[in-house]
Amino acid sequence: MDNRGEFLNNVAQALGRPLRLEPQAEDAPLNNYANERLTQLNQQQRCDAFIQFASDVMLTRCELTSEAKAAEAAIRLCKELGDQSVVISGDTRLEELGISERLQQECNAVVWDPAKGAENISQAEQAKVGVVYAEYGLTESGGVVLFSAAERGRSLSLLPEYSLFILRKSTILPRVAQLAEKLHQKAQAGERMPSCINIISGPSSTADIELIKVVGVHGPVKAVYLIIEDC
């Protein structure tokens, strides 16, 4: 017996079992929670659970609206939060909902323009409210998912004091596993991946110091979800 065999034999004896030279199949997992948790919920139940978690745990304000009333709801919320300075993502989906145009009319909002370069960041830094379109909501965490692009800068949801996220009810997913699957499908289809994928769960929240909870140390002080009931 060579040194390797002798060593392995000693290990096997210490474990109280015969020497194994071939790998053993792993036991079947007891569950598949990583992929299946919350998938039993229908879309309405997902939305209800999403709102409850976001409101109770993340201290995020949630409102429901229709496509037809989305623009007026966005105006009202921006005015409540502080319409003296509003920046909007250059996302065409906000334009299609009429939100971009109405906020420019009513709140003198500025639209993120890639051609302006660093000026966009300065405007976002001085803004009271940033308005962005969320790709998905995650029921488990109460967070929203943002895909960055030239017309959708990361500063829009980071620098303003308040963030208003426009989210469609139909895009609320059970958890991050389903988000990963959608990204995988995009990659398999040859679609270009976003430069940055942000999962935002409302304002920052920490209780590191003496277990005293402090909200809004970084990121938006307050987040608002405007959920469009499209299903």
UniProtKB/Swiss-Prot annotation:
Coiled coil: none annotated. The gene is ykgG. It holds the Pfam family LUD_dom. This is Uncharacterized protein YkgG. InterPro entries: FTHF_cligase-like_sf (IPR024185), LUD_dom (IPR003741), NagB/RpiA_transferase-like (IPR037171). One of its GO terms (molecular function) is L-lactate dehydrogenase activity. Belongs to the LutC/YkgG family. Gene3D superfamilies: NagB/RpiA/CoA transferase-like (3.40.50.10420). GO terms for cellular component: cytosol. SUPFAM superfamilies: NagB/RpiA/CoA transferase-like.
